[in-house]
């Protein structure tokens, strides 16, 4: 009986450890892998239009279990006339350079944050701020077309702001290995099958890439994914 209990204890311990180390990536993980400084909430109204419009194309992105190359291009990002915390978005997507599909949607503000200490050795000028903002997003493709669905998730973007000016897009942590910005972490759900797949993209890196990105200082897709639209990175 004692041996049986010991065996069950060992089995339970292995199962627990496996569960602990196999937790799915979360948006909090995305924040931790992007931000290299302490921060706190920043309760202020910010006009994020210039920040969000700074980068509209040339994101790295993937979709599905095979990490097929996903390209996202924004053609229009503007403020909602009805809600100051919502930005109306238009653009198009393609997968492995095929199936170009237009979408419309929104970025909805969640929170602003500011860094509590300078990100460089040199202190900021009086009144200047560095920080980031988080948004939820939903991008809806044309349901009348084949192979279409809805992109949905959360996003963060880094910015800097001089005193009495609007924030601007900023690569604050450009000196770090694995630098990244404008990180979209989410899913795509097919209208037809209702199946949901991972679909994420970003500047310089893709959030929660797991074994996909082998690079340290640079973005390098693993060889087993080259056939899914990443041939240009073949080495």
Task: Pin down the residues of each PLM region.
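Bacterial Sec-dependent N-terminal signal peptides
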Residues: 1-27
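Central antiparallel beta-sheet cores of small beta-barrel/beta-sandwich binding domains
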Residues: 25-235
């Amino acid at each position: 009986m004692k041996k049986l209990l010991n065996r069950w204890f060992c089995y339970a311990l292995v199962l627990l450890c496996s569960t602990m180390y196999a937790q799915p990536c979360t948006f909090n993980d995305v924040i931790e892998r992007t931000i290299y400084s302490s921060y706190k909430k920043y309760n202020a109204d910010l006009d994020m239009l210039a920040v969000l419009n700074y980068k509209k194309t040339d994101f790295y992105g993937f979709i599905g279990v095979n990490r097929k190359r996903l390209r996202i291009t924004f053609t229009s990002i503007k403020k909602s006339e009805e809600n100051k915390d919502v930005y109306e978005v238009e653009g198009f997507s393609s997968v492995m350079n095929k199936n170009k599909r237009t979408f419309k949607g929104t970025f909805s503000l969640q929170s602003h944050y500011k860094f509590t200490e300078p990100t460089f050795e040199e202190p900021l000028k009086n009144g200047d701020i560095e920080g980031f903002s988080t948004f939820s997003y939903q991008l809806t493709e044309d349901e009348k077309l084949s192979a279409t669905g809805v992109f949905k998730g959360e996003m963060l973007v880094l910015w800097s702001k001089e005193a009495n000016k609007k924030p601007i897009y900023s690569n604050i942590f450009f000196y770090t290995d694995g630098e990244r910005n404008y990180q979209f972490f989410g899913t795509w759900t097919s209208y037809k099958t209702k199946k949901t797949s991972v679909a994420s993209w970003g500047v310089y890196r893709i959030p929660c890439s797991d074994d996909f990105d082998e690079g340290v200082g640079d973005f390098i897709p693993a060889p087993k994914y080259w056939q899914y639209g990443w041939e240009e990175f073949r080495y």
